[in-house]
Amino acid sequence: MFTIAVIDTETISANEKKFCYNVGYVILDTDSRSIVCKKDFVVQQIWHNRALFETAYYADKRPLYVSAMRGKRATLDKWGYIMRDMRRDFREHKVEAVYAYNSPFDDSVFTFNCDWFKTNNPLDTLPVLDIRGMVSEFITCTEEYKQFCEDGNHFTEKGLYSATAETVYQYITADETFEEAHTALADSEIEAEILLACLDLGAEIGKEYKVVSFLWRNNEKPLTIKIDGEVIYSGVYRKKYVREGLYSFKTEI
């Protein structure tokens, strides 16, 4: 049995300080594909600092957290106690690796807050791996996924194929109405499903896969370059750049 944790954090950014107000995680038995533990915490020090919390990008979700805490689905606690409970859960379930979607971000959030609140970091003794690497290797590289993005208009602001957890989850579930909750536990749960989908496609637990950050659209256009009337290149290009009157063409992905 190989047991892993999938974590997610929600943060505010105050002068580049990544204060975390919501921590969620699920612990998975990858053999049975079952969740053996899940937790949702609201960080007391940030929650009670109303002015600070209101700077959060998803501050409008405060009523959701109130409802979750009243319904005992989330726990309000201090950062140090949250880290203590997390370490205890990891030990009890023999967690061997931690995963997150865009793990460098969540890893840095834990590092900052554990340093700020002077607590031990439960991630220090475990490998922290990026689910996006699996996704890059087994999902977003496929022509089926790219066609899904074309058909559903799933692009970034720069016109690249989207590879967000929301878009990937829509793809693996064939549910384009799905919207990511942007709360820590809910996001951990869908990211765990994405990870399991990658395992079903052949991904290996514990192996680090390269993250492909830019998913260029394969829009080929004809390109012919002549010098003194002689053709020196005839083919296609996929992207054109213009800088200070000079043209550059990207001919390969």
PLM region spans:
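Short, polar/flexible loop-turn hinges at active-site or ligand-entry regions and domain interfaces
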Residues: 67-73, 117-124, 175-181
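Short, solvent-exposed S/T- and G/P-enriched segments that are highly enriched in secreted/extracellular
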Residues: 230-245
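Substrate-recognition/cap helix-loop segment adjacent to the acidic, metal-dependent catalytic center
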Residues: 105-129
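Active-site-proximal helix-loop-helix substrate-binding element of RNase H-like nuclease domains
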Residues: 45-67, 132-188
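Short, ordered, surface-exposed loop/turn motifs in non-cytosolic proteins
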Residues: 220-227
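Acidic, Mg2+-coordinating catalytic module of metal-dependent nucleases/exonucleases
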Residues: 94-104, 109, 114, 151-213
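A short, solvent-exposed beta-strand micro-motif common in secreted/extracellular proteins
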Residues: 247-253
